[in-house]
Amino acid sequence: MSNHTHHPKFKTLKRAWKASKYFIVGLSCLYKFNLKSLVQTALTTLAMITLTSLVITAIIYISVGNAKAKPTSKPTTQQTQQLQNHTPPPLTEHNYKSTHTSIQSTTLSQPPNIDTTSGTTYGHPTNRTQNRKIKSQSTPLATRKPPINPLGSNPPENHQDHNNSQTLPHVPCSTCEGNPACSPLCQIELERAPSSAPTITLKKAPKPKTTKKPTKTTIYHRTSPEAKLQTKKIMATPQQGILSSPEHQTNQSTTQISQHTSI
C-alpha cells in the first residue's frame, strides 16, 4: 500500500475515515444528552458511509491486481527483428549441396577396418550403402515420359520373363491426345490389367421377317328351299339368245310351214 498512497482514491478514503471518527465522537455526545432519534439517524448514515468505503477499497485492490498481471510493455521492433534472425533459413539447392558434400567428406574420412589376425584390410560396407542412399536422395526425380515408338502404330511385343518382370508406367489415355506414341501404352496397360477383364456381349440373331398374306373372306348366304327350286327351274329352261340344238331348230321350221299352209 506504500506505493499507492498518492492515488486520489486513497486520499478520499483517508478523509472519509477521519470524518467518520469525528462523526462517532459527535454521536456519543448526543447519546449522553438523551437524543435517541438523532443517534439512530446518524448511525444509519455511518453504516452507509462504511459500506461505500469498503466497496471502493475492493475495487481499488482488484484494479491493482489486474494491472500487475497484464504486461504493460509491448515487444519492440528490435526484439521482433532478433526473433526473425534466429529462425533457420529455408533449404535451397546451395545449402543442400553443401550439406551433401559435408556428409560425403565425413564418410570418406573414416579409416578402414583392419583385421589384426589375418593382416588384411577391408573397407566398411556401410559406407557404400550410405553413399548410394545419399546419391539417390540428391538426384532430383525426373519426370517420366512415355518411350517414343519409331514404328508408330505397331505396339511392342509383350516379352514376359518369369525371372525379370518389368512393369511399365501407367499412362492414362486422357493425356494421349495428339501423341501417337502414347496410344500403344494405353492398349498394353489395358491388356495387362488383371482386374479389368474384357466383357463379352452376345449379339442376338435377328429374327426373319414374315409377311402375312391377306386371307380371302368367303361370305355364306343362307338360301330357303323355295329359292333353290327356282334356281333349278331357271337352269332347266333355256334362255333366249342361246344357241339351241339342231333338233330344236327343225321342229321350229316344221311348225312355221304348217302355219303358212293353213292360211
Swiss-Prot record:
<feature type="glycosylation site" description="O-linked (GalNAc...) threonine; by host">
    <location>
        <position position="87"/>
    </location>
</feature>
<keyword id="KW-0472">Membrane</keyword>
<feature type="disulfide bond">
    <location>
        <begin position="176"/>
        <end position="182"/>
    </location>
</feature>
<dbReference type="GO" id="GO:0020002">
    <property type="term" value="C:host cell plasma membrane"/>
</dbReference>
<feature type="glycosylation site" description="N-linked (GlcNAc...) asparagine; by host">
    <location>
        <position position="127"/>
    </location>
</feature>
<feature type="compositionally biased region" description="Polar residues">
    <location>
        <begin position="151"/>
        <end position="166"/>
    </location>
</feature>
<feature type="glycosylation site" description="O-linked (GalNAc...) threonine; by host">
    <location>
        <position position="92"/>
    </location>
</feature>
<feature type="site" description="Cleavage">
    <location>
        <begin position="65"/>
        <end position="66"/>
    </location>
</feature>
<feature type="transmembrane region" description="Helical">
    <location>
        <begin position="38"/>
        <end position="66"/>
    </location>
</feature>
<feature type="compositionally biased region" description="Low complexity">
    <location>
        <begin position="72"/>
        <end position="86"/>
    </location>
</feature>
<feature type="topological domain" description="Cytoplasmic">
    <location>
        <begin position="1"/>
        <end position="37"/>
    </location>
</feature>
<feature type="glycosylation site" description="N-linked (GlcNAc...) asparagine; by host">
    <location>
        <position position="251"/>
    </location>
</feature>
<comment type="similarity">
    <text>Belongs to the pneumoviruses glycoprotein G family.</text>
</comment>
<feature type="region of interest" description="Disordered">
    <location>
        <begin position="197"/>
        <end position="218"/>
    </location>
</feature>
<keyword id="KW-1015">Disulfide bond</keyword>
<feature type="region of interest" description="Disordered">
    <location>
        <begin position="69"/>
        <end position="166"/>
    </location>
</feature>
<keyword id="KW-0325">Glycoprotein</keyword>
<dbReference type="GO" id="GO:0019062">
    <property type="term" value="P:virion attachment to host cell"/>
</dbReference>
<feature type="glycosylation site" description="O-linked (GalNAc...) threonine; by host">
    <location>
        <position position="215"/>
    </location>
</feature>
<feature type="glycosylation site" description="O-linked (GalNAc...) serine; by host">
    <location>
        <position position="253"/>
    </location>
</feature>
<protein>
    <recommendedName>
        <fullName>Major surface glycoprotein G</fullName>
    </recommendedName>
</protein>
<feature type="glycosylation site" description="O-linked (GalNAc...) threonine; by host">
    <location>
        <position position="139"/>
    </location>
</feature>
<feature type="glycosylation site" description="O-linked (GalNAc...) serine; by host">
    <location>
        <position position="105"/>
    </location>
</feature>
<dbReference type="Pfam" id="PF00802">
    <property type="entry name" value="Glycoprotein_G"/>
</dbReference>
<keyword id="KW-1043">Host membrane</keyword>
<dbReference type="GO" id="GO:0046718">
    <property type="term" value="P:symbiont entry into host cell"/>
</dbReference>
<keyword id="KW-1160">Virus entry into host cell</keyword>
<keyword id="KW-0964">Secreted</keyword>
<feature type="glycosylation site" description="N-linked (GlcNAc...) asparagine; by host">
    <location>
        <position position="163"/>
    </location>
</feature>
<dbReference type="InterPro" id="IPR000925">
    <property type="entry name" value="G_prot"/>
</dbReference>
<feature type="glycosylation site" description="O-linked (GalNAc...) threonine; by host">
    <location>
        <position position="80"/>
    </location>
</feature>
<keyword id="KW-0812">Transmembrane</keyword>
<feature type="compositionally biased region" description="Polar residues">
    <location>
        <begin position="98"/>
        <end position="129"/>
    </location>
</feature>
<feature type="region of interest" description="Disordered">
    <location>
        <begin position="242"/>
        <end position="263"/>
    </location>
</feature>
<dbReference type="GO" id="GO:0016020">
    <property type="term" value="C:membrane"/>
</dbReference>
<feature type="region of interest" description="Binding to host heparan sulfate">
    <location>
        <begin position="187"/>
        <end position="198"/>
    </location>
</feature>
<keyword id="KW-1133">Transmembrane helix</keyword>
<keyword id="KW-1032">Host cell membrane</keyword>
<dbReference type="GO" id="GO:0005576">
    <property type="term" value="C:extracellular region"/>
</dbReference>
<feature type="compositionally biased region" description="Basic residues">
    <location>
        <begin position="204"/>
        <end position="215"/>
    </location>
</feature>
<feature type="glycosylation site" description="O-linked (GalNAc...) threonine; by host">
    <location>
        <position position="199"/>
    </location>
</feature>
<keyword id="KW-0946">Virion</keyword>
